[in-house]
Amino acid sequence: MTSVNVKLLYRYVLTNFFNLCLFPLTAFLAGKASRLTINDLHNFLSYLQHNLITVTLLFAFTVFGLVLYIVTRPNPVYLVDYSCYLPPPHLKVSVSKVMDIFYQIRKADTSSRNVACDDPSSLDFLRKIQERSGLGDETYSPEGLIHVPPRKTFAASREETEKVIIGALENLFENTKVNPREIGILVVNSSMFNPTPSLSAMVVNTFKLRSNIKSFNLGGMGCSAGVIAIDLAKDLLHVHKNTYALVVSTENITQGIYAGENRSMMVSNCLFRVGGAAILLSNKSGDRRRSKYKLVHTVRTHTGADDKSFRCVQQEDDESGKIGVCLSKDITNVAGTTLTKNIATLGPLILPLSEKFLFFATFVAKKLLKDKIKHYYVPDFKLAVDHFCIHAGGRAVIDELEKNLGLSPIDVEASRSTLHRFGNTSSSSIWYELAYIEAKGRMKKGNKAWQIALGSGFKCNSAVWVALRNVKASANSPWQHCIDRYPVKIDSDLSKSKTHVQNGRS
């Protein structure tokens, strides 16, 4: 108990060091001021009169500096609102339904009809991965894959993506009452499906956006592309004043489904599900009052210069010529290394002085003592961040980040619940997690939320937001009909998940 109190005292002293120093300084100046006489004031005024040019120049430079700072500083970027797509109920799939879809896909593939469908080991492998994935029985599959026989056509892929994007945007425009023609910047990201005309062009056409819109379409950038899109929109909002930026993050499941027998490529079939999010950003000062959040920091880390990082998630042909996404056995180590580099950049921006000092001290000690100190000090990010939105890439990803960042079960609750309810929706998963926190009523004014996105390349990207008010869930939130059933409890044997309401956590 004593060590805990000492640590708390240490953190308080360092975090409030400048404030603590300010009190004696203020007292000293107040004491000096109380001893001033009328004669001292006359002498001071006389000094100003004899040095009028110097005083005037100093005042002019001060005013010029303040004006220059106000004019050149970037405008704040506000998150007015966002919308996560909720697919229709008939697209819900249980674990057993997903297994049936896998079987139908393999059966429909003429090159594997006599082998893969009759291979119990392949389907048994898929079943084990599916049951241990952390996904529940109410995730969503695209229309084309539910159809018997499955439709893996280009038209089915386009239909899936258009329904997700249009559905999310219609709800966003309805909630914000923003006219689509007011949008000045558009960024759409979809890794696997990039038709011509582009998805951003489809949005322009569907919602009749204006002809001078700054439009961007990001492809092939993986599950971390959502934060990349936010970062790009932020930079554009710093240049183009008084406008709105629209960010759309989604992924296509129909296009990315794998029908072969390579087990490294089968895993993604078990994790990815339908989902997408639309986010409205603004740099208009008048939008602060109605916005939910202000963007504080974005940090992007790319370790693609290393071959192991570059190849750990890769779309390629298998031995029989079928295209799939191969997940390397090195992915966990690569993700950990990339995350470490990302938080090494983000930490100094958000951590209190006490944590910065401890990290710096252990860094110097490790350099001097080398082998005597095995690990660097892991900062307590819970002192700087109130809510964590970790990409719901899978149970292993969430477990690893929970351990590496020293988080508690409630810190990763939003991620686990999103994975269970919606599966891995790729770049949009961090928005379903933020919506979960809002639906639980936990987002209070001044709270900071940290979105952590991991993706192929290999990339780790972070976005930190601060709540401008007590944030409630928006209309038509994806959690509005099921939030009372969460969080979920996953059995320790990883084989089955059961949903129940924990006392005091609903």
Curated annotation (Swiss-Prot):
GO CC, any one term: endoplasmic reticulum
FAE domain residues: 69-368
Protein's GO biological process: fatty acid biosynthetic process
Keyword check for Glycoprotein: no
Catalysed reactions, semicolon-separated: a very-long-chain acyl-CoA + malonyl-CoA + H(+) = a very-long-chain 3-oxoacyl-CoA + CO2 + CoA
Disruption phenotype annotation: Strong fatty acid chain length ratio (CLR) reduction.
Stored Pfam families: ACP_syn_III_C, FAE1_CUT1_RppA
UniProt-reported outcome of changing C223A: Loss of activity
Keyword Acyltransferase set for record: yes
Single GO MF annotation: fatty acid elongase activity
Tissues where the protein occurs: Expressed specifically in seeds, especially in embryos. Expressed in siliques.
Family: Belongs to the thiolase-like superfamily. Chalcone/stilbene synthases family.
Protein name as catalogued: 3-ketoacyl-CoA synthase 18
Protein source organism: Arabidopsis thaliana (Mouse-ear cress)
